[in-house]
């Protein structure tokens, strides 16, 4: 059986081929009655307007790029992708994921973008743009939405981010309420030419520590040594543990930039004959699936919901609809399990 064509749909619906094209693309200059008639004819013939034809007629690619740092199969990145897809796919947009791991890959991506212009919008997750990159996006009129990015930069048309300062304030107040007076924050090394969301988290901890500082409270920021290739989580935890134990006075509580690093840190601390949480409390960040399995106390963020909100903002920008709140913050949630406790007692109760 021959594949149905737009001419077949036009004949069955009793309209022109141009009207079929406009109706199936959702153009506004088609009556609802005609649109329904055309759609019924298309359904009867199992006809679908090709995206390439639709793009040629509308001037749109019907494609949105999701640019993330790190690997696509990581918990946070896959969650954001799922949320973006849920919002964009039902209205006909393809979501094209791309990932970068260092500055050279980021520069290469942006050097190729103006030449291809193969997307209608771009969502950038968990890292900051450089001024030259933002200029490139503006030059090709590409709407830009950020996920977990600094909202004060002005480099994004819209954004949705976890409230890092609120999260770190919760963490500091929790640990202080449990009697801890020597609290550290542990993070991986971040190159000076990149600004990731985790670096915002480090600054948020420093700000929260300053805001909650009182006599007798000590805060420490511990960062891995500079390295070119990414460290494994176990190697990173080993290095951070060595830094913790080399302090003049060992902290009794540690906040960690991600759950994965926190879990590796707990394992390394126990190898050093330190009991968690009796000797040292550990608090992660993310509440990924692995955190529940490891019974890790942590701070929850919702990457799927972040992706959904980013997807909705993209659609509003593409439709030229006003955004009531272009830049939003997602509230974090403390999840207490069994890696935090009072300094003088057993483990904190599970959630």
Regions found by a protein language model. Give the residues of each.
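Flexible loop/turn connectors
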Residues: 238, 242-351
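Hydrophobic alpha-helical segments within soluble ligand-binding/sensing domains
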Residues: 160-186, 203, 207, 233-243, ...
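Short beta-strand segments enriched in small/hydrophobic residues
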Residues: 19, 56-72, 182-191
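Alpha-helical recognition/docking segments in bacterial nutrient-uptake
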Residues: 1-5, 62-173, 246-249
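An alpha-beta-alpha
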Residues: 169-212, 326-341
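Short beta-strand elements in bilobed, periplasmic/extracellular small-molecule ligand-binding domains
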Residues: 88-100, 202, 206-234
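N-terminal helix-turn-helix DNA-binding module of bacterial transcription factors
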Residues: 1-61, 350-351
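Short acidic capping loops at alpha-helix termini that bridge into adjacent secondary structure
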Residues: 181-182, 216-218, 276-282
């Amino acid at each position: 059986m021959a594949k149905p064509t737009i001419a077949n749909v036009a004949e069955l619906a009793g309209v022109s081929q141009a009207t079929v094209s406009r109706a199936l693309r959702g153009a506004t200059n088609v009556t609802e009655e005609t649109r329904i008639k055309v759609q019924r004819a298309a359904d009867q013939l199992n006809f679908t307007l090709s995206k390439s034809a639709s793009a040629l007629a509308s001037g749109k690619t019907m494609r949105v790029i999701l640019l993330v740092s790190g690997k696509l199969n990581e918990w946070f990145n896959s969650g954001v992708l799922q949320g973006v897809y849920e919002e964009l796919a039902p209205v006909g947009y393809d979501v094209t994921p791309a990932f970068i791991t260092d500055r050279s890959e980021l520069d290469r991506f942006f050097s190729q973008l103006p030449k291809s212009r193969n997307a209608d919008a771009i969502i950038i997750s968990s890292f900051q743009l450089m001024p030259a990159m933002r200029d490139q996006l503006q030059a090709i009129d590409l709407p830009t939405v950020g996920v977990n990015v600094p909202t004060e930069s002005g480099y994004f048309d819209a954004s949705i981010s976890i409230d890092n300062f609120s999260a770190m304030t919760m963490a500091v107040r929790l640990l202080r309420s449990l009697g801890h007076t020597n609290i550290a924050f542990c993070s991986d090394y971040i190159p000076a030419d990149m600004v990731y969301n985790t670096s915002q988290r480090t600054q948020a901890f420093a700000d929260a520590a300053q805001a909650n500082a009182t006599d007798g409270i000590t805060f420490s920021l511990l960062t891995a040594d500079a390295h070119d290739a990414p460290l494994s989580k176990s190697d990173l935890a080993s290095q951070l543990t060595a830094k913790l134990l080399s302090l003049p006075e060992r902290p009794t509580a540690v906040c960690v930039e991600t759950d994965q690093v926190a879990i590796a840190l707990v394992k390394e601390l126990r190898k050093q004959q330190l009991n968690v949480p009796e000797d040292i409390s550990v608090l992660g960040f993310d509440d990924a699936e692995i955190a529940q399995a490891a019974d890790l106390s942590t701070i929850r963020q919702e990457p799927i919901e972040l992706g959904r909100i980013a997807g909705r903002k993209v659609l509003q920008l593409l439709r030229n609809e006003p955004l009531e709140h272009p830049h939003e913050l997602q509230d974090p949630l403390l999840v207490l399990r069994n890696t935090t406790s009072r300094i003088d007692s057993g483990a904190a109760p599970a959630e």
